[in-house]
């Protein structure tokens, strides 16, 4: 899923939403439950 921006307070939420509810930011990458 799309990149995570550390300066965006919503980025973790956007990542999770993009991943269909399961997603985490690891550095600049948004990783879904499958790893990308």
UniProtKB/Swiss-Prot annotation:
GO terms for molecular function: chloride channel regulator activity; toxin activity. Keywords: Chloride channel impairing toxin, Disulfide bond, Ion channel impairing toxin, Knottin, Secreted, Toxin, Voltage-gated chloride channel impairing toxin. The keyword Secreted applies. Expressed by the venom gland. It is found in: Secreted. The keyword Disulfide bond applies. Disulfide bonds join 1-18, 4-25, 15-30, 19-32. InterPro entries: Scorpion_toxin-like_sf (IPR036574), Scorpion_toxinS_Cl_inh (IPR007958). SUPFAM superfamilies: Scorpion toxin-like. One of its GO terms (cellular component) is extracellular region. Toxin with unknown function in healthy organisms. On glioma cells, interacts with chloride channels (probably ClC-3/CLCN3) and MMP2 at the surface of glioma cells. This complex is then internalized via caveolae, thus inhibiting the chloride channels necessary for cell shrinkage and tumor propagation. Belongs to the short scorpion toxin superfamily. Chloride channel inhibitor family. The presence of a 'disulfide through disulfide knot' structurally defines this protein as a knottin. This is Chlorotoxin-like peptide Bs 14.
């Amino acid at each position: 899923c799309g990149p995570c921006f550390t300066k965006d307070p919503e980025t973790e939420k956007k990542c999770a939403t993009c991943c269909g509810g399961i997603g985490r930011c690891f550095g600049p990458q948004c990783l879904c439950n499958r790893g990308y």
